[in-house]
């Protein structure tokens, strides 16, 4: 059997391997077996989902698999991914499951898991679960089948946790906030939380129909929110993705700020207050060199990891760091959450606005980014373009052209069949030529796929 787990659980197109109802049933049974190894009858799991049409299918299939092995299932309905991590801990569950493909289109879906501590499962745990899927799992006796129950107040519990992360002496009165929920899991939670804190809320992307998640809106399409900010004269825009674990911020002029600018702001503010653990920020290899230079000038360190918020979190836990994230908008603040939380990060930015009395355009302009270019090349199943001699030669030549004054990063996506080619260099022309040469070689290697 091919490897199921990628960098963020199991993901693919709905009704195609591995994202079929049959496979979800097998995954549920294997996970149930894994967490019932000690034979206890008290094990429970919480399941959340985003707003994709296929979410109902996978919710039922997973529930069937889990209960067939004696697990008791608590169904949260549509909630953000970070809410699942939170409620797994607060409801004393052994496992949390989120059904979502995050920022991907509605035709995709995915399944990701959280352990009893609210953090994503380790690679070792996923490997053991895959082995159980391959070998098959026996169902329990009829009297030992687990129960399934819907939990109606999950989103309200999450809203209360969000509000406790916001300074108690502060309100958002007078702030006009555009919140783009990507027609996803936060379409009710986010506007409600902002309204309860006193903001004037302009909600967009809050009309999910099962097929429009991330469609022309949310963190992958921030221009929609940017246009709304300008049209309404708003102070700031907050763009979430389909499961609300990432955020992109918009200033009052409509300019888009990425995760690097937000992390720079929070690292600076936390360091000034003695709150930044180990005076360091954890980010991935995709974060801009400008961020690294900015932190260095402040006497702070940048710890880089592989791409994926799970690797950021693993490094944070191993090194005792409390702030990390990705340029794409996954922001992890372990003082408040166990995983990337777009809405939590957005609230921390609003707190910075109210405390500093500075506009978003100032707060999101911490450093001048080094020019960066990212291009993707799609490949077909079974192809290994990075092993092609032509591609290796093009990469070596491009690295030589950058002459140690920039960066070249080539990697396969962990969630899609893409080769990502990224370069940074102060000379735009040199950077573009380096990327073009590698992209051309990869495209040739895959036959223009």
Swiss-Prot record:
Keyword terms of this UniProt record: Isomerase, Magnesium, Metal-binding, Phosphoprotein
InterPro entries: A-D-PHexomutase_a/b/a-I, A-D-PHexomutase_a/b/a-I/II/III, A-D-PHexomutase_a/b/a-II, A-D-PHexomutase_a/b/a-III, A-D-PHexomutase_C, A-D-PHexomutase_C_sf, A-D-PHexomutase_CS, Alpha-D-phosphohexomutase_SF
Annotated PROSITE patterns: PGM_PMM
Cellular component terms per the entry's GO annotation: cytosol
Active site residues per record: 102 (phosphoserine intermediate)
Binding site for Mg(2+): 102, 241, 243, 245
PTM (free text): Activated by phosphorylation.
Cofactor(s) needed: Mg(2+)
NCBIfam families in UniProt: glmM (TIGR01455), PRK10887.1 (NF008139)
HAMAP family xrefs: GlmM_B
PANTHER family: PHOSPHOGLUCOMUTASE (ALPHA-D-GLUCOSE-1,6-BISPHOSPHATE-DEPENDENT), PHOSPHOHEXOSE MUTASE
Protein name in UniProt: Phosphoglucosamine mutase
Lineage, highest ranks first: Bacteria, Pseudomonadati, Pseudomonadota, Alphaproteobacteria, Rhodobacterales
Gene encoding the protein: glmM
